[in-house]
From Swiss-Prot:
Subunit structure: Forms heterooligomers with SWEET1, SWEET3, SWEET6, SWEET7, SWEET8, SWEET9, SWEET11 and SWEET17.
Predominant cellular place of this UniProt entry's protein: membrane
Domain called MtN3/slv: residue spans: 10-97, 133-216
Cytoplasmic side: 29-42, 91-104, 154-166, 214-294
GO BP terms in the entry: anther dehiscence; callose deposition in cell wall; gibberellic acid transmembrane transport; pollen development; seed growth; sucrose transport
Membrane topology: Multi-pass membrane protein
Keyword line: Cell membrane, Membrane, Repeat, Sugar transport, Transmembrane, Transmembrane helix, Transport
Species whose genome carries this gene: Arabidopsis thaliana (Mouse-ear cress)
UniProt name for this protein: Bidirectional sugar transporter SWEET13
Compartments (UniProt record): Cell membrane
PANTHER family: BIDIRECTIONAL SUGAR TRANSPORTER SWEET13, RAG1-ACTIVATING PROTEIN 1
Family according to the record: Belongs to the SWEET sugar transporter family.
Stored Gene3D superfamilies: 1.20.1280.290
Length: 294
């Protein structure tokens, strides 16, 4: 087997499988919460649908490599299984509107889209040409997914808060990207290495931002508006794939309740109390008058 003749490729491939395995399990707490509450709340399904599509693409690409990318198949096969479980759970607990939209995206992207790619590659390309076409598609999809963390980093810079960007996940995603980068270099595969250059860079930027803003005290005015800036999709999206993009976090998917109405409520309560309160001297005079009347 060609892979065993390259010690570094084998080492980085095994490390990449282990780290990616951990990253694939990152959404487990989210789905435990969904199962307990029997509701998907504000979470979205796009990250998991995208992750499944990415894993399917990389398996198909690795199958064209004559066994030299076997470790890509193992981790992405696990990814297909775990992402399918996530999607089934999500659809089971989603409301009707969300369920229908999820199934539409799943059908268009993972069934029709993937089937179209397979048909085009099988009918119109052969050998190294097919490998190049598939590699280009995989790189293009992975790079497009890398745009998701940019929205999260923008929120961090604007709000001066790292609430939506946990350091641990950013660290694991960065390590995973670096590992698969070296794996791609070891097997001399440009299509595996290239997306992870961007992944490693964005992961490093996320950790730097976290260190900068970790102890920054967020002004109240900014803190009340930051939930408006966070939108999902993040996606994450396909954050849990072999070619790991930047973190698109579940906390970003689930938007917290808006806080901008709280000060107004307090003001209203204060006004009500002030209207109901009477001056102590006036109250004493009224009591004296009542006693004199008696």
């Amino acid at each position: 087997m060609a892979l065993t003749n390259n010690l570094w490729a084998f080492v980085f491939g095994i490390l990449g499988n282990i780290i990616s395995f951990v990253v694939f399990l990152a959404p487990v707490p989210t789905f435990v919460r969904i199962c307990k509450k029997k509701s998907t709340e504000g979470f979205q399904s796009l990250p998991y649908v995208s992750a499944l599509f990415s894993a399917m693409l990389w398996i198909y690409y690795a199958m064209q490599k004559d066994g030299t990318a076997f470790l890509l198949i193992t981790i992405n096969a696990f990814g297909c299984v775990i992402e399918t479980i996530y999607i089934v759970l999500f659809v089971s607990y989603a409301n009707k509107k969300t369920r229908i939209s999820t199934l539409k995206v799943l059908g268009l992207l993972n069934f029709l889209g993937f089937a179209a790619i397979v048909l085009v590659c099988e009918l119109l390309t052969k050998g190294s040409t097919r490998e190049k076409v598939l590699g280009g598609i995989c790189v293009g999809f992975s790079v497009s997914v890398f745009a998701a963390p940019l929205s999260i980093m923008r929120v961090v810079v604007r709000t001066r808060s790292v609430e939506f960007m946990p350091f641990s996940l950013s660290l694991f995603l960065t390590i995973s990207a670096v590992t698969w980068l070296f794996y791609g270099l070891a097997i001399k595969d440009f299509y595996v290495a290239l997306p992870n250059v961007l992944g490693a860079f964005l992961g490093a930027v996320q950790m730097i931002l976290y260190i900068i803003f970790k102890y920054y005290k967020t002004p109240v005015a900014q803190k009340t508006d930051k939930s408006k800036d966070v939108s999902d999709h993040s996606i994450d999206i396909a954050k849990l794939t072999t070619v790991i993009p930047g973190a698109v976090l579940d906390s970003a998917v689930h938007q917290p309740p808006a806080l901008h109405n709280v000060p107004e409520t307090k003001i209203q309560l204060t006004e009500v109390k002030s209207q109901n309160m009477t001056d102590p001297k006036d109250q004493i005079n009224k009591d004296v008058q009542k006693q004199s009347q008696v």
